[in-house]
Amino acid sequence: MTNQQGRLRTRVAVFACVAAAALIVDQLTKAWAMAALSNGQTIRVIPGLLSFTLVRNPGASLGMGSGATWVISLLAVVACVALAVAGVRTVSMKWSVAISFAFAGALGNLIDRVMYADGFLDGKVVDFLNYGWSVGNVADIYLVVAGVVLVILILMGEPFSHKDLIEQSDESLQSEPEADAK
């Protein structure tokens, strides 16, 4: 096994382990919410800021798209496939971890849409974290955090692919003669 293959295996293993652990936490919290809050009960955690309230959301974030559940489900399938491919293709452990959280969030909500479906791709997501202005779940938190981290990685210029590494290497080699000339 080459060093490159070993690093790929490590990144894939980290991607799989982080995604699996995050997905398990998401699904366990949703199972708890359905068991503890199914009778319409609300549990106040931080008054005025956070409470637990069970909601079955057919739409996307903030309830948008509730009339197009099948479109949202189809987009979630495409997103999961794209994120899995990206998680395997990246050369950066930072990208791999961030993408694994996005994958876990997308897959966690897709699992809900399949498990709690009224028809083909017509399911609802289990939301229970009531912030007062929105109700979400742990998968939503993963998606938001992953999105923020991905933007930070882009802004920091963290290489995603071998091509990015080569371009960064070429740029640093080109700037070295300029530094030597000064």
UniProtKB/Swiss-Prot annotation:
The catalytic activity of this protein is classed by the Enzyme Commission as 3.4.23.36
GO BP term, pick one: proteolysis
Q: Where in the cell is it found?
A: Cell membrane
Membrane-spanning segments: 12-32, 68-88, 91-111, 135-155
- Superkingdom of origin organism: Bacteria
**Bilayer topology:** Multi-pass membrane protein
Give the Gene Ontology MF terms in alphabetical order.
aspartic-type endopeptidase activity
Q: Where is the active site?
A: 127, 140
Principal localization?
Answer: membrane
- Entry function: This protein specifically catalyzes the removal of signal peptides from prolipoproteins.
Task: Output this protein's name.
Answer: Lipoprotein signal peptidase
* Biological source species: Bifidobacterium longum (strain NCC 2705)
